[in-house]
Amino acid sequence: MELVGWLVDKGITSEKQWIQEDQASYISFNAASNSRSQIKAALDNAGKIMSLTKTAPDYLVGQQPVEDISSNRIYKILELNGYDPQYAASVFLGWATKKFGKRNTIWLFGPATTGKTNIAEAIAHTVPFYGCVNWTNENFPFNDCVDKMVIWWEEGKMTAKVVESAKAILGGSKVRVDQKCKSSAQIDPTPVIVTSNTNMCAVIDGNSTTFEHQQPLQDRMFKFELTRRLDHDFGKVTKQEVKDFFRWAKDHVVEVEHEFYVKKGGAKKRPAPSDADISEPKRVRESVAQPSTSDAEASINYADRYQNKCSRHVGMNLMLFPCRQCERMNQNSNICFTHGQKDCLECFPVSESQPVSVVKKAYQKLCYIHHIMGKVPDACTACDLVNVDLDDCIFEQ
């Protein structure tokens, strides 16, 4: 009984973990004649007790208080990307304790080498049982997610075949899934962590992409955008750092807003350079000097016009040219498809002396974009073309 209790407290489920934790005790138990059967029985009993009586916070939250958290790698990654570590830690703690109800998923989004997989891998390996989503196998994608403490969805995509089951799992609902060579099994509410550099709210159906499930999927997630690349010697997040981070979060809990985008703030800014570090710029000879563009008309910043951005432009504050993928991602929220924003001042200019009112048109037929969106626009050139009557055309007469 003492051995099983020790295995449960340490979260040990295999002989390899036992050797790594306490090699001397493993050798002493392995020295007896019937040791193999005792070791196997103890590990099996410990696994059953953990799966039935323990949850993820029992192994994610450390026992000892943390005095200095500034050297923690998870803390550094969040601070580097502009997040308030205390607020972000409260999001992670509430996610692990299933405090947010339907919002049961943390989505770490960003390009490669930004630390998203580093964080997710460390959290998954800290708990005794975690499952991985095999999105490449559309018949049994959640085969490994039954009776787990944490579910990890690594670099996946959302397809039309699995979206309904995925919404139930991401929302913390009980759902039965098919298993290979077995009968269907029930997945209980389990915290889910997703890492990807693609849009997980866009559903791929063959060679087409739809956004009809975007809002339901966003209602089930907290999204962290990690855009700052880490140094090559940054290192891996350890299990102890995960426990220290969650323990620090438990001791410094703040109120969390239930919203898709986790708000940023509280990051440290780099100090301004001193006068001694600023050198006088070199003068360009008049014969090769180019005209300055400061007096020219400012170019359009498309970064301000896109509410949702693709993986190539998610961290950009300045976009000089439009993006076709960003246009598609904003079609369900923007009216002006030419510039990608709702209130386009170029298409609908407003003067203080003589404001211009937008003329609303009534359409009997809608273009394919507004037909999919299910909204009637105030004005749309594509809808104008659809509603043209060829009998009224001079050339047809």
Swiss-Prot record:
Parts forming coiled coils: none
Chain residue ranges for the region called Disordered: 265-296
Keywords of the record: ATP-binding, DNA replication, Host nucleus, Nucleotide-binding
Major location (coarse): host cell
Subunit relationships: Homooligomer. Interacts with host PRKX.
Binding-site positions, ATP: 110-117
Signal peptide start and end residues: none
Role noted for this protein: Plays a critical role during packaging of viral DNA into empty capsids, where they are thought to be part of the packaging motor complex. The single stranded genomic DNA is packaged in a 3' to 5' direction and requires the association between viral DNA and Rep40. Regulates host PKA activity by interacting with host PRKX as a mechanism to interfere with helper virus propagation and to promote its own replication.
Keyword ATP-binding attributed: yes
Record localization: Host nucleus
InterPro entries the UniProt entry points to: Helicase_SF3_DNA-vir, P-loop_NTPase, Parvovirus_NS1_helicase
Entry's Gene Ontology BP terms: DNA replication; viral genome replication
One GO cellular component term: host cell nucleus
Official protein name in the record: Protein Rep52
MF term (GO), any: ATP binding
Annotated gene: Rep52
Domain SF3 helicase stretches: 84-239
